[in-house]
Amino acid sequence: MVNVPKTRRTYCKGKECRKHTQHKVTQYKAGKASLFAQGKRRYDRKQKGYGGQTKPVFHKKAKTTKKVVLRLECVVCKTKAQLSLKRCKHFELGGDKKQKGQALQF
C-alpha cells in the first residue's frame, strides 16, 4: 500500500517561484472524453448503418494496475505540475501514518 501526504515541499517551475515551495497534492483523474474529437467523430461515422463492429475491440489486457499520477499545485502561484509514481494495487492520499506492530487494514 502506498500512502502519500496531502502536502509536500518541492520545486515549483512557475515564473514567480522557481524555488521549493509548499504544494497541495491530489490524484490525477482522466477527464471525460470529448464527443467532438476527430477520432471519435470518424469512429462514430464508420459505425453508423449496417455492418456491425468496424474496428477491432481490444481483448489482450496485460496490466493489472495503473501508474498513479499526482497533481501538485503550488500554494503560492497556483502552478500545477504532474508527477507519476510506480504501479501499485492500493493507493492512499493523506492516510494515517503506519505504527510499529500494527496489523494491515484494507
Curated annotation (Swiss-Prot):
One of its GO terms (cellular component) is ribonucleoprotein complex. Keywords: Ribonucleoprotein, Ribosomal protein. One of its GO terms (molecular function) is structural constituent of ribosome. InterPro entries: Ribosomal_eL44, Ribosomal_LSU_eL42, Ribosomal_zn-bd. It comes from the Eukaryota. One of its GO terms (biological process) is translation. Belongs to the eukaryotic ribosomal protein eL42 family. This is Large ribosomal subunit protein eL42. The gene is RPL44.
